[in-house]
Amino acid sequence: MDVVFALGHFCEAEGPSIIFCTQKLHRSTVSKFFEHPTSKRSIGVTENGNDSPEAFKNELDNRNNADSQSLQSSTESLFKADSEDYLCKKVSKGPESPRVNSFHNSYSRNQSPISRKSSCVTCSTVLPLEFSVPDVQPRLYTNSSTNPDVLYMSSQHPHTQQRYSTLKRLMVRCLSCEYSTLSEASDSMSNPLFFGDQDNGYVISQSFSLRDPSARGGLRRYAIIATCPNQLDLILRYSFISEKFLHIVQFLRISSFNTKNDYSSSRSKTTASSSNGTFASPSFNISSLSGSSNIGTAPSYEISSSIGANVSSLAHTQRLPSFSFLRRRDDIGEGRSLVDITCWDGIFVGLHSSFSWILEVWDLLVV
């Protein structure tokens, strides 16, 4: 079974990007990550600094028992999104996402794609302090309850270059050219979509939008996908997967809606201006161009026959207005991660437990 669950979004700076993915791996495969220098201080490394494969396996067992209750509660919170009382108890204000360096400065051929760093806040995976290690890419592990040699790992990117490239292409299609009709539940969510081919695999996709005042149009577009090279495996589980995707999306939408007003009231936005041009505010209109400092008085473009001037001479003498408000925003990098949008610092822990649970019962879903 080569199934990957992933969450992506359309980044204003990088385009369609992968934020989070969960995959089923064997322990022998996971131990290879510690061959890379950037992976030695992982969440699976033992407290005494011993990073051998045997010590790593023992530490995984110990930490899995300690974190099982928190992961289980996170799974229930995503699959019970219609309970507003539960949200009021579980959703807490998370810290603003820290800035991260671009992966172009730290990536090398010897590193796995899992060690890449996102270049913006909106594409980053932010974990609670108890699940994170400083200077190490966020990763989560869950042991399989049926097979001791299998575990489920979540990270921002898959662990192999081939799987990363394939997942990247599928995410680009989900957020650019593959569209479905709008869902009856909400205008900001489409119906589940199934597509794929033999080369890149097959996908069940659920695209949706979340309220984010810092995004263009006040909405940020996301997509949850389940990809598998076997078309029949996804078709047999289409109803179950699409139902669980709907529950996750409902939870995320309720969380972002409840925190939208709090964010709008705490952050005051002003009209950005620079010497190179004028940038528009939401109340900006075309008539205000005449009062702009870099335009002066609005010129007249009417041609009078009594003057005797031709169009070519006026084109050189008259100064056209600078429609610089149509230019790209300078604050494009000032986005918010999914943690800030939902105001829940454990949102990626909940996604990990939800995707891991689906992978755990994958073989039991065939009717």
Curated annotation (Swiss-Prot):
Decide whether keyword rRNA-binding is in the record. Answer: no
* Listed PANTHER family: FOLLICULIN, FOLLICULIN FAMILY MEMBER
A molecular function GO annotation: GTPase activator activity
Protein name as it appears in the record: Folliculin-like protein bhd1
Query: From start to end residue, where is composition biased (Basic and acidic residues)?
Result: 54-64
Any one Pfam family match given in the protein's UniProt record, by short name: Folliculin
Q: What is its main location?
A: nucleus
> What compartments host this protein?
Nucleus; Cytoplasm
InterPro entries, sorted: FLCN/SMCR8_DENN, Folliculin, Folliculin/SMCR8_longin
GO cellular component terms, A-Z:
cytosol; FNIP-folliculin RagC/D GAP; nucleus; vacuolar membrane
Provide ranges: composition bias, Polar residues.
65-75, 99-115
Q: Which GO terms describe its biological process?
A: Golgi to plasma membrane protein transport; negative regulation of TORC1 signaling; positive regulation of TORC1 signaling
Q: Where is this region: Disordered?
A: 41-75, 92-115
Which family, according to the similarity comment? Belongs to the folliculin family.
Q: What organism is the protein native to?
A: Schizosaccharomyces pombe (strain 972 / ATCC 24843) (Fission yeast)
Q: Which UniProt keywords apply?
A: Cytoplasm, Nucleus
